[in-house]
Amino acid sequence: MTARSCRNYENDFMSTTIDGSQFPAQGSFAIVVSRYNDSVTRRLLDGAVDTLHAAGISEESIQIAWVPGAWEIPLVAAQFARQSGIDAVICL
């Protein structure tokens, strides 16, 4: 049996931190939120909207769609992604 080396994740891409200052202060954003586990997803939505506002995104530039559960998220996200006026889709 030979010894295995452990992978060093120190310089891996997943260690990169992206903060709100890297968002453009313009654009239209869609947020798709699952109603399932509402007590969690509402708080995630609040955090996402607060982060967009902190980056200078106006309330008018944010569209929110509630869906019943996780299965519907990709369907609605794909519809938003096909719209020419949406710059990013956030799925919660």
Residue ranges and their predicted role:
Residues 67-78:
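Structural motif
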Residues 1-13:
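Short, Lys/Arg-enriched N-terminal segments with co-localized hydrophobic residues
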Residues 2, 16-17, 41, 51:
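Residue-identity detector for threonine
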Residues 10, 59-60, 72:
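Glutamate identity and glutamate-enriched acidic tracts
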Residues 76-92:
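Glycine-rich phosphate-binding loop
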Residues 10-33, 40, 77, 83:
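Anion-binding alpha/beta catalytic cores of soluble intermediary-metabolism enzymes, centered on
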Residues 10-11, 49, 89:
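Generic N-terminal initiation segments characterized by hydrophobic and/or small/turn-forming residues
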Residues 22-68:
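Glycine-rich phosphate/diphosphate-binding loop of Rossmann-like nucleotide-binding domains
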